[in-house]
């Protein structure tokens, strides 16, 4: 359990920050593994190297193997959840007049996946 402060709503604010990072990290991980494959590299070897180096993130280590396993991999959090969460974070950013340049990119990727019928994956 993490103490998120005394003010009402601080826990939700922490969650928004977390979801921004998670959304962007998942998309970055997918693009990195896609690049590795297009370069003719063994994606599993690249994943092992990246999770041991400066480019590692929890999402890369957790979701990377599932990405390589394909659609039969167990689902940890559905695409539809990220569609919802990126929308909530985007609304919050608009209210605060803050430019979160990577968020719209991640949001479009999740929305595109949902449109392909992967919202529950």
Q: Would you name each region that the model predicts?
A:
Residues 2-5, 102:
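General beta-strand structural signal in soluble alpha/beta enzymes
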């Amino acid at each position: 359990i993490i103490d998120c402060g005394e003010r009402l709503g601080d826990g939700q604010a922490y969650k928004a920050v977390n979801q921004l990072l998670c959304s962007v990290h998942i998309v970055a991980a997918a693009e990195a593994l896609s690049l590795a494959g297009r370069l003719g590299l063994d994606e599993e070897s690249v994943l092992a190297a990246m999770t041991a180096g400066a480019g590692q993130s929890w999402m890369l280590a957790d979701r990377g193997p599932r990405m390589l396993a394909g659609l039969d991999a167990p689902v940890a959090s559905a695409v539809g959840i990220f569609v919802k969460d990126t929308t909530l974070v985007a609304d919050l950013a608009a209210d605060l007049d803050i430019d979160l340049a990577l968020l719209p990119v991640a949001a479009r990727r999740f929305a595109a996946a949902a449109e392909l019928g992967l919202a529950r994956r």
